[in-house]
């Protein structure tokens, strides 16, 4: 049988950036890697209700900079920034170096693979029919400009005795085109019948400039909108 390579792994350095970017000598590499794992595990557990998309980690000059990509930044920041300050102290204690936390808002959660997968799992845990949850996710993604989306669920669907896999696709999802921007994510729904796995592939279009173009587009998206100049008022003066 044909097997599928991990869509994010095969595109690393081509259209996908790394989630951890730092350099370390042989002595410190394992410690840094384990520290990253612990930080991600802690933040995922603490922010399970904050629509967490991904966590990126950088280590400039004996410190750690964590960027939390979330659809609900208000939940992460908390009242007057209290919650984010608690997180910063906890991350500094785990990593053993001074920590800085940045919050990045995900503007279109319907086009984020991880958030779509988590949305489907939460619906399955609330006993929503799996076909309805899949179809709703696909329709929302296509409505907001996705070029294609595929959703796959597998397990004891609807409480069936025998586990099976069902999938639904709309549009194009070219997994072998390296310049294709494919957002792939997985999630698990813990139901009374057992665990149901959810996989999501979202095709957002082709990237022609490589990783530099991806980074430039991300920076442009995160930049705050400039206020429009009021030409009428200036003319009146």
Curated annotation (Swiss-Prot):
Alphabetical list of CDD domains matching this protein: KH-II_30S_S3
Residues in KH type-2 domain copies: 39-107
Source taxon at top rank: Bacteria
Its biological purpose: Binds the lower part of the 30S subunit head. Binds mRNA in the 70S ribosome, positioning it for translation.
Subunit architecture: Part of the 30S ribosomal subunit. Forms a tight complex with proteins S10 and S14.
PANTHER family listed in its UniProt record: 30S/40S RIBOSOMAL PROTEIN S3 (PTHR11760), SMALL RIBOSOMAL SUBUNIT PROTEIN US3C (PTHR11760:SF19)
Annotated family: Belongs to the universal ribosomal protein uS3 family.
Stated name of the protein: Small ribosomal subunit protein uS3
């Amino acid at each position: 049988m044909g097997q599928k390579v991990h869509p994010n792994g095969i595109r690393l350095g081509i259209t996908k950036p790394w989630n951890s970017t730092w350099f370390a000598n042989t002595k410190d590499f394992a410690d840094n890697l384990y520290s990253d794992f612990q930080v991600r595990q802690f933040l995922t557990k603490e922010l399970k209700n904050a629509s967490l998309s991904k966590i990126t980690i950088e280590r400039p000059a004996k410190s750690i900079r964590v960027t939390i990509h979330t659809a609900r930044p208000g939940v992460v920041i908390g009242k007057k920034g209290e919650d984010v300050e608690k997180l910063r102290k906890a991350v500094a204690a785990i990593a053993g170096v001074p920590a800085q936390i940045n919050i990045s808002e995900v503007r279109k959660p319907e086009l984020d693979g991880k958030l779509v997968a988590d949305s489907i799992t939460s619906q399955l845990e609330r006993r929503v029919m799996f076909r309805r949850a899949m179809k709703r996710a696909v329709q929302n993604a296509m409505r907001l400009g996705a070029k294609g989306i595929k959703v796959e669920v597998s397990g004891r669907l609807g409480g069936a005795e025998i586990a099976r896999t069902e999938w639904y696709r709309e549009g194009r999802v070219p997994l072998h085109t390296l310049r294709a921007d494919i957002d792939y994510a997985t999630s698990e729904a813990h139901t009374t019948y057992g665990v149901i796995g959810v996989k999501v592939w979202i095709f957002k279009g082709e990237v022609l400039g490589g990783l530099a173009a991806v980074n430039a587009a991300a920076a442009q998206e995160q930049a705050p909108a400039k206020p429009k100049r009021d030409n009428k008022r200036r003319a009146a003066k």
